[in-house]
């Protein structure tokens, strides 16, 4: 089932310098909660500066949903320590509040009023909040309080020079973009390995179902918890953050222009369903527009091609201008075993897997075939640890045992690990292979199995509260290592000044900005 990568691996072993200088970044979301686990109703803490313009600390959907961002980094330990410093400083600013350590929220009542993230009075700030109002009216607020980790990854220019013969980013943008699209197609085919190993949302609180009927064969505990015994990541299931209306958009990952055209079509195509919501009620805006996507960011995807945007530029225009610069991997649940929601083992695994995705052959995929890859993901998400579970290839009927496919994949990953270890010294990447390979013989070693044991005993709420308390104490007591308190104070003040500048420079009415998004 795994493509034959032997030639590409032999090439890599002859050109180890092609992997010198991999760049990464991390984003981690977490809900602010009270000591009893309920959602915090306070505003974004002033000590954390402006959520609109702060470089490292912002908010996602809700005012209580923090998002931490590291700068681009070539050093894994440095990046994780930076992320930990942001957590340490934030933990000291939250008073009695905690950071929820799980992807799925628990103590949110159906119909509870969840305050949307606020970004000030500028047009761009108001548009961000209105976009969230649209998400709430389209999908419900509860779905938007789910948290995850995003891992951003780029291969060094040396890789593309050696592999494709390009000279630089500008002249080589078509070849580099084609290479990243190959990675994305392989990710759709084999990325289910991420929820298998690291999925950590095998259960949900009953409030999450909001009384809606479900066909999933949930088992129920006495404390209002529903779980599937072999599930890995309900966050990635239809109960979590997905969007059924997007499944037939026909967006494909074969070619940059084709991908962008599909995206632009979706933000210009009216939706009958969303038109029913309306654009305004009693003078209050309800969504940016009633198209299938209000803006490009609304496209739900487990992985995205990205380029840093310039001011006033949409993500797709940035891609057309400069090609794909990096890839954003979006399938990681919050790691409940780490105070910062992610650890070095996961980052090293993702390095290995994304390099493999860039090396393995990946035929072009139609939109139908993309939908077929979803079958494997759904199996792994809902019953990934089930003994004897099998997976298919694309739309073909042949089935292969997940455990065997996983072991075959790790045989390749070990060779990538040897190359990366030869560059960095030590055995860190090979050690990750040893640790994770064991999960295919014993699914009880996976994140989902480990956290489910605790949840069955303590409930989701009990597990979440205990971890939140432990990490709060731990982070508050640890000294800062890379950033200083002065750095955080300076960025707080600078971010507030930047927001005021944006607000002062607004020259057009908000309605004119909205008209451009119609």
Curated annotation (Swiss-Prot):
Top-level enzyme category: ligase
GO MF term set: ATP binding; glutamate-cysteine ligase activity; metal ion binding
The protein's annotated pathway: Sulfur metabolism; glutathione biosynthesis; glutathione from L-cysteine and L-glutamate: step 1/2
SUPFAM superfamilies the record matches: Glutamine synthetase/guanido kinase (SSF55931)
Positions in coiled-coil regions: none
Keywords noted in UniProt: ATP-binding, Glutathione biosynthesis, Ligase, Nucleotide-binding
GO BP annotations, alphabetical order: glutathione biosynthetic process
InterPro entries linked to this entry: Gln_synth/guanido_kin_cat_dom, Glu_cys_ligase, Glut_cys_ligase
GO CC, alphabetical: cytosol
Known catalytic reactions: L-cysteine + L-glutamate + ATP = gamma-L-glutamyl-L-cysteine + ADP + phosphate + H(+)
Family to which the UniProt record says this protein belongs: Belongs to the glutamate--cysteine ligase type 1 family. Type 1 subfamily.
Record's protein name: Glutamate--cysteine ligase
Organism, as annotated: Klebsiella pneumoniae subsp. pneumoniae (strain ATCC 700721 / MGH 78578)
Classification lineage: Bacteria, Pseudomonadati, Pseudomonadota, Gammaproteobacteria, Enterobacterales
């Amino acid at each position: 089932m795994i493509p034959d990568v032997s030639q590409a691996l032999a090439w890599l072993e002859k050109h180890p310098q092609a992997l010198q200088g991999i760049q990464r970044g991390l984003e981690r979301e977490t809900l602010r909660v009270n000591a009893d686990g309920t959602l915090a109703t306070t505003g974004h803490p002033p000590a954390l500066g402006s959520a609109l313009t702060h470089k490292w600390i912002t908010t996602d959907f809700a005012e209580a949903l923090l998002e931490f961002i590291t700068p681009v980094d070539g050093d894994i330990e440095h990046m994780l320590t930076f992320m930990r410093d942001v957590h340490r400083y934030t933990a000291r600013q939250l008073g009695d509040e905690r950071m929820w350590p799980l992807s799925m929220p628990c103590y949110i009542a159906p119909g509870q009023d969840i305050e949307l993230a606020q970004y000030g009075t500028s047009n761009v700030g108001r548009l961000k909040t209105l976009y969230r109002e649209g998400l709430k009216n389209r999908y419900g607020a509860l779905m938007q309080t789910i948290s995850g980790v995003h891992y951003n990854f780029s291969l060094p220019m040396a890789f593309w020079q050696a592999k494709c013969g390009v000279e630089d980013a500008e002249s080589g943008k078509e070849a580099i973009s084609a290479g990243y699209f190959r990675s994305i197609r392989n990710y759709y085919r084999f990325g289910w390995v991420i929820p298998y190993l690291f999925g950590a949302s095998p259960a949900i609180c009953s409030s999450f179902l909001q009384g809606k009927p479900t066909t999933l064969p949930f088992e129920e505990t006495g404390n209002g918890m529903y779980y599937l015994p072999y599930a890995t990541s309900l966050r990635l299931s239809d109960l979590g953050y997905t969007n059924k209306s997007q499944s037939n958009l026909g967006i494909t990952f074969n070619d940059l222009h084709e991908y962008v055209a599909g995206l632009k079509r979706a933000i210009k195509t009216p939706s009958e369903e969303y038109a029913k919501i309306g654009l305004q009620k009693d003078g209050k805006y309800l969504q940016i527009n009633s198209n299938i996507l209000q803006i490009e960011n609304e496209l739900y995807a487990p992985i995205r091609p990205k380029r840093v945007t310039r001011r006033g530029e949409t993500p797709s225009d940035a891609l057309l201008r400069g090609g794909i610069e990096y890839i954003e991997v979006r399938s990681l649940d919050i790691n409940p075993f780490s105070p910062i929601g992610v650890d070095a083992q996961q980052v090293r695994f993702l390095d290995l897997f994304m390099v493999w995705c860039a090396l393995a052959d990946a035929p072009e995929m139609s939109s139908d075939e993309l939908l077929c890859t979803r079958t494997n993901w759904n199996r792994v998400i809902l019953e990934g640890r089930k003994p004897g579970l099998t997976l298919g290839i694309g739309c073909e009927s042949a089935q292969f045992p997940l455990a065997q496919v996983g072991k075959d994949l790790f045989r390749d990953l070990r060779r990538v690990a040897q190359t990366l270890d030869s560059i960095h010294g030590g055995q860190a990447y090979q050690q990750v292979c040893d640790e994770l390979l064991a999960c295919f013989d014993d699914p009880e070693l996976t994140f989902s199995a480990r956290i489910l044991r605790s949840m069955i005993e303590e409930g989701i709420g009990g597990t979440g509260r205990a971890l939140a308390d432990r990490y709060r104490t731990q982070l508050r007591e640890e000294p800062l290592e890379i950033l200083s308190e002065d750095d955080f104070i300076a960025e707080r003040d600078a971010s507030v000044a930047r927001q005021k500048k944006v607000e002062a420079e607004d020259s057009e009415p908000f309605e004119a900005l909205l008209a451009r998004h119609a």
